Regions:
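Short beta-strand in the C-terminal region of the ABC ATPase nucleotide-binding domain
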Residues: 267, 272-273
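ABC family nucleotide-binding domain
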Residues: 46-267
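ABC-family P-loop ATPase nucleotide-binding domain
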Residues: 1-56, 273
Length: 273
């Protein structure tokens, strides 16, 4: 498994490069969403938009309405915080925006094309190619190295045979990203050998390896101490500035939200500001 993912178990030292010189995974993003991709659009400032989202969870005869008529826009190249207390519905909203779940009412568009009503397979393709996602918990595979964890999304996105043909390029991309997040000395370490902050930095590199247009972050500092959390936040903001990457971040922390370009407040399933 290890050799399949990265082609080598030897330690390597990535070439030093500036953050803006990171090798991009070469993709033709001009195809329509039917194939899992969405064409880039310069006509609108909004890369992602949701209208009148409602989500109800049902268990037997009981219903809990988690979101009620929520409108949301993510501005291209900006960092938007979704701020709210536990139970306000902010993580549910992020999961809907990331096509991990579907709304009971309302619609979501990405680059002007609707995505919430796509068949599951096409939603998965869209998410794999267009989005990067990080969570409070890191979800690194414990059996493989940090480098292999970062490379893994490319195997899933490209399919085994296409991945094997371009594995060297994907490895170089993963090494450069790990260098960018300060983990060039941890390429061959497994998750159990990393600190919490290092695991989250590895998760950020993994989320970026496919060159997503949009990064969704669900409480990315929630499992870290304040100092480490501030380091992770600073890293995300630097990546936003360097790459122009659009970021939507869920948080309950006012100080984190204050550093974002825009703040959306959510209370009891409704956007209030």
């Amino acid at each position: 498994m290890n050799d399949l993912v990265d082609g080598s178990t030897a330690r390597t030292s990535p070439r030093r490069r500036g953050a803006t010189e990171l090798t991009s995974v070469q993709e033709d993003r001009s195809q329509v969403v039917i194939a899992g991709r969405i064409p880039l659009s310069t006509a609108s400032d909004q890369i992602l938009e949701a209208r009148q989202l409602t989500k109800i969870y049902r268990k037997g005869r009981n219903e809990v309405q988690v979101l009620s008529g929520c409108d949301f826009q993510a501005r291209r190249g900006k960092v938007t915080a979704i701020l709210g207390q536990s139970g306000s519905g902010k993580s549910t909203l992020l999961h809907l925006l990331g096509t991990l779940d579907t709304p009971d009412e309302g619609e979501i568009t990405f680059e002007g094309q609707r995505i919430d009503n796509l068949p599951r397979r096409r939603r998965d393709e869209f998410r794999n190619r267009q989005l990067g996602m990080i969570f409070q918990f890191y979800h690194l595979l414990p059996e493989i190295t940090t480098l292999q964890n970062v490379m893994m999304p490319m195997m899933i996105q490209q399919g085994l045979f296409s991945y094997l043909r371009a594995r060297a390029a994907y490895r170089a991309r993963a090494e450069q990203l790990l260098e960018r997040v300060g983990l060039e000395h941890r390429l061959t370490h497994r998750p159990r050998e990393l600190s919490g902050g290092e695991m989250q930095r590895a998760a950020i590199a993994r989320a970026l390896v496919g060159s997503p247009q949009l990064l969704l972050a669900d409480e990315p500092t929630g499992n870290l101490d304040r100092e480490t959390g501030q380091t992770i936040l600073k890293l995300l903001l630097e990546i936003n500035r360097e790459q122009g990457l659009t970021i939507v971040m869920v948080t309950h922390d006012e100080s984190i939200a204050a550093d974002c370009d825009r703040v959306i407040r959510l209370e009891d399933g409704r956007i209030v500001a």
